[in-house]
Amino acid sequence: MKNILYIGWIGFNNLGDELLWNIFRDTCAKYLDDNQVTLIPSLPGTDLKNFDRYDTIVLGGGSLLLPGYLQMLQNALNKGKSIAIWGSGLDWIEKSNLELLTNDQLSSLEQNFKQKDIDVLEDVIENALFVGVRGPLTKKAIEIMLGSEKAKKVKIIGDPALLLKKTSLNQPQENLIGINWGTTFNRLYGANEAILEEQLVEAAKQLINKGYKLFIYTMWPDDIPHCERLYNKINNPDNVILDKTLYTEQQLIDKLAKCKATINFKLHANLLSLTANVPAIALGYRFKVFDFVALVGLQHLIISTDSKQLTKEVLERIEIIEQTGPMIMEQYHTSQKTYMPLLESLFSQNYL
């Protein structure tokens, strides 16, 4: 019997992270014999300093390519354990560095990784069974730190949520726009959620004037008060639904399927929307969101949260969706077909 530890930010009721674990578990069940493999999720209370009972440690989906998690993987290697990275990515890279990176002008990531952290990253990548990262910006950042030769082993496999499928029958869309709102405790580009919220309120009012109804939804209990405040500021109960229910991924996909478009704060809200065949406007609040839209070729639908014209940009992107919605979904499904086998290759090609 092989014991596999899945490391993720799980056990905190955050749907985005929980669904990544669910996908890992379900993909294991599809390819691996459950009589030969035991999966252990890193729920709160799991001792991440003692890997004695595990054979393989998998760093799962999310933005977990951080010095602390990489140190855990190196510790596991030093204990003779196998390690793998599956769909994880970088985050926390400053906006100015994101722009330099995108334009191939960034030479260092010393704000995020000191030399000792880069040494750990190099050791982990060199000795891992499998290194699959979320998106092209993550891979580019690794190349800056290690050089392109040492980063060759790093594959862009996509966000594991690309494996999500809509299980229910199609239903007619309504004149409804979903809005996912919440908080990052001001740890976002622009560093000012209050200004962002005011611009979103104005965009919401203008969308109602255009004839849309709005559906405000949440991904995490901590986000509920922020959704309530947004609802109260829009102050139009006849045209706005506030849904505080914390759904499973499939339940939320079914809810979103009624929308014509969504505007999303949290990264995986975009993936749930796209799974529901609904084009998504991503509020680019940190590096990870830009990494994802670059992966699926939907950069024209992202709005940086430091934008001073967010209201105008939301309305422009809604117009793009009104005019080209089917093309947007075709682009997403093309990307999905590319990355699904790469995400499954960890399991299908016997790395585990």
Which residues are covered by each model-predicted region?
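Active-site anion-handling motifs in enzyme catalytic cores
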Residues: 1-352
